[in-house]
Amino acid sequence: MTLKEYKSGQAFPGVIGRTFDVSKPACPAPNRAREGAPNVLFIILDDTGFGHLGCYGSPIKTPNLDALAADGLRYNNMHTTALCSPSRSCFMTGRNHHSNGMSCITEGSTGYPGGNGNIPFENGMISEILLQNGYNTYALGKWHLTPAEQTLSLIHI
């Protein structure tokens, strides 16, 4: 039973003990990542290649990224469209950019199949998979996955 299903006047389905630690709420415990599950951090950078990060042998000093890479996974075989929106949509869904409706950057959405700038709901995103497995998710920074006509532009105010 969830809290939304619990109605006043019904028998309380939980347990109210003398202390919190021996009490049980009416709703089930939230899904949690398994014990020892790794932390997951994705960093997506535009206009960056192997020659820009120290962890790939670059002379450019990137100590914080190098430290993260030393304790995590580093990808060295990848595909890019050389455009941010299509590449980001591939990364976020694990699908080809045309199946995501991202044949180009969202400002260039064509309205044709594979180029409407809208990721289909059924394609899902990695954040949804993580949530289903008890992870908390957070996105920060440039999104650039919405067609221009669906965003607020200061030019039109």
Show the residue positions of the predicted features.
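Formylglycine-dependent sulfatase
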Residues: 1-155
